[in-house]
Structures are given as C-alpha cells and as structure tokens.
C-alpha cells in the first residue's frame, strides 16, 4: 500500500481536511502510521491526538464523522489532503470549520456557521 513519509515529521504528518463538494477547509490534524492505516481500512478519518497521545476517530464522541472520499498527497509525500463528506460540525467548538474566524486588524471576526452547542455534544 502506498503511504506517506512519516519519518520526516518524527512519525507525524499534517492532514488538511476539506469538504469534498465545496472545497472548504474544515480542519488541520495530524496522522501517524497507525491512524493512516485505520483511515484507509475504515474509510473514516482517524487522527493522532498530540494532546492525548492516542488515536482519535473523528466523530466517535460527537457523531460528526468524516467519510473519506479522496486523498491527495504532496510532492514530498509528507503532507496529505483528505477530501471528506462531513457529518455535522468539524470543529469541537461547534462550528462547521475550525477556520471560522478571520483576522481583521487586531481582532477576530466570526465568519463561520455554528452548527451545534459543544456542551450538548460532548457531555
């Protein structure tokens, strides 16, 4: 099976996640070889949580799964783009995308759509 070069990034590669229809950037996460293999095997995005130091199946707690539709790999084979069918919010804050804020001068402007209350989703 083809796979990214996990050596360059000390075992991790960045995974940029995009909506497969709109092209909207939903999030950035990291994958190790184990999460890569699980993702390829299951068809659901699985990442490596750097804070918890464990595998993380996107949507396992919230129900907001990311179904893989296409995978792109960069020229150095050390970063990927996952084109996904997003169910619900991609961001743990309840927004559709983790990139829901725009920098305007010295402040943030909310430009994204909040889909859920995280207090209700992550009980």
Curated annotation (Swiss-Prot):
Keywords recorded for this protein, A-Z: Amino-acid biosynthesis, Cytoplasm, Histidine biosynthesis, Hydrolase, Magnesium, Metal-binding, Zinc
GO biological process, one term: L-histidine biosynthetic process
One Pfam family it belongs to: PRA-CH
EC number annotated for this UniProt entry: 3.5.4.19
Pathway: Amino-acid biosynthesis; L-histidine biosynthesis; L-histidine from 5-phospho-alpha-D-ribose 1-diphosphate: step 3/9
One Gene Ontology term, aspect cellular component: cytoplasm
Residues given in the record as Mg(2+) binding sites: 74, 76, 78
SS bond partners: none
Catalysis: reaction(s): 1-(5-phospho-beta-D-ribosyl)-5'-AMP + H2O = 1-(5-phospho-beta-D-ribosyl)-5-[(5-phospho-beta-D-ribosylamino)methylideneamino]imidazole-4-carboxamide
UniProt subcellular location: Cytoplasm
Cofactor, free-text remark: Binds 1 Mg(2+) ion per subunit. Binds 1 zinc ion per subunit.
InterPro entries on file: PRA-CH, PRib_AMP_CycHydrolase_dom, PRib_AMP_CycHydrolase_sf
Obligatory cofactor(s): Mg(2+); Zn(2+)
Residues involved in Zn(2+) binding: 75, 91, 98
Keyword RNA-binding set for record: no
GO MF, one example: magnesium ion binding
Domain of life: Bacteria
Similarity annotation: Belongs to the PRA-CH family.
Function: Catalyzes the hydrolysis of the adenine ring of phosphoribosyl-AMP.
Subunit comment: Homodimer.
Protein name as catalogued: Phosphoribosyl-AMP cyclohydrolase
